[in-house]
Amino acid sequence: MAKILLSKENLFYNLDVISKKAGSKEKVAVVLKDNAYGHGLVEIATLAKEFGIKKAVVRTIDDALKIEKLFDFILVLAEKSFHTYSHTFHIALNSLEDIDKLPNNSNVHIKVDTGMHRNGIYPEDLEKAFLGLLERNIKVTGVFTHHRGADELSTDFFWQKENFSLVKKSVKNICEKLFLPIPLFHSCNSAALFRTENFDEDFTRVGIATYGYLDDSDVFNFPKLKPVMSLWASRLSTRILKKGQSVGYGGTFTTTEDMLVSTYDVGYGDGFLRLNERKSYTTPKGYKVLGRVSMDNLSLNTDDEKVCIFDDVRELAKIHDTITYEITTTLNPNIEKEII
């Protein structure tokens, strides 16, 4: 059956590069949302702990529960239903209206909208948020924001950095006024970290770089990272097609000579985005995908028992006119994973 192989060596290499840029392992929070960008939540969390990472970021409480014993600190980004809670969980407050929904005595990181206009409270509402949380005995353990264009060549990155600097000053003044401890500050995602000279925040939230990718790395002279994931498929059947015969739905690939063709057990049902006559892809070993990708299989000009479908998703991202994130996160979470 199809299988995802996860390279421990490559993951550790990436985490080492990230940790050195951040200043230490303690200043790195590995982002594990959406099944660790398709790589496997528990698998990547276990390896990150082994490397020495103590902070993680997930999407929901249910995700946090699966890795609760692996980290000292888990930031939950988008939870609305608090059926359980742990002292290691820190809940993102995305709007003022959510203050009344938070568990009593919980830890909260206030998200501030510094320009992305997606989630977070406005800077002018910070004191209102602190007072509302204080009334409910909820501890503000962090304040953060998210960059909308750190991986793009524009001034947005510097504009948002300046906005967050003003937020930090405001928060410090509020905490002094209310006799509260200064919370942790964090804003840098993968691209923002590597565009920041002399990183000085409390920690960085690193997602895609953990898994070996930094989009537009050539533009910013980012470090070369190593992809962690490779997707492998097993042979289902083999046949010899005569010259002029066609393969798959629609018969969009026709042989120009007698050809050996095998089907392999990966398809768009596994989250491998559909290829067709307008989207041509060749595997790392040089086998071209023939015709249309089906729900459960695809065809190649080989009879190898196992074939590496990809070990770097950047080429597929170009073919599908998308980003590396989408290629990995759309993979079916039920695909077997093996750490190598």
Swiss-Prot record:
Record-level GO BP terms: D-alanine biosynthetic process
Coiled coil feature spans = none
Under InterPro entries, the record lists: Ala_racemase, Ala_racemase/Decarboxylase_C, Ala_racemase_C, Ala_racemase_N, Ala_racemase_pyridoxalP-BS, PLP-binding_barrel
Named in its record, the pathway it takes part in is:
Amino-acid biosynthesis; D-alanine biosynthesis; D-alanine from L-alanine: step 1/1
Q: Which cofactors does it use? A: pyridoxal 5'-phosphate
Q: Which domain of life is it from?
A: Bacteria
Q: Which CDD domains match?
A: PLPDE_III_AR
Q: Which GO terms describe its cellular component?
A: cytosol
Q: Could you tell me the keywords of this UniProt record?
A: Isomerase, Pyridoxal phosphate
Question: Pfam families given for it?
Answer: Ala_racemase_C, Ala_racemase_N
GO MF terms listed in the record are:
alanine racemase activity; pyridoxal phosphate binding
**SUPFAM superfamilies per UniProt:** Alanine racemase C-terminal domain-like, PLP-binding barrel
Sequence positions that bind substrate = 118, 295
Where are residues bearing N6-(pyridoxal phosphate)lysine located in the sequence? 33
Q: Which reaction does it catalyse?
A: L-alanine = D-alanine
> Which residues does the entry assign to the active site, renumbered to this chain?
33, 249
User: EC?
Assistant: 5.1.1.1
Q: Where are the transmembrane segments?
A: none
Function, in words: Catalyzes the interconversion of L-alanine and D-alanine. May also act on other amino acids.
HAMAP family documented for this protein: Ala_racemase
What does the similarity note say? Belongs to the alanine racemase family.
Q: What is this protein called?
A: Alanine racemase
Q: What is the lineage of its organism?
A: Bacteria, Pseudomonadati, Campylobacterota, Epsilonproteobacteria, Campylobacterales
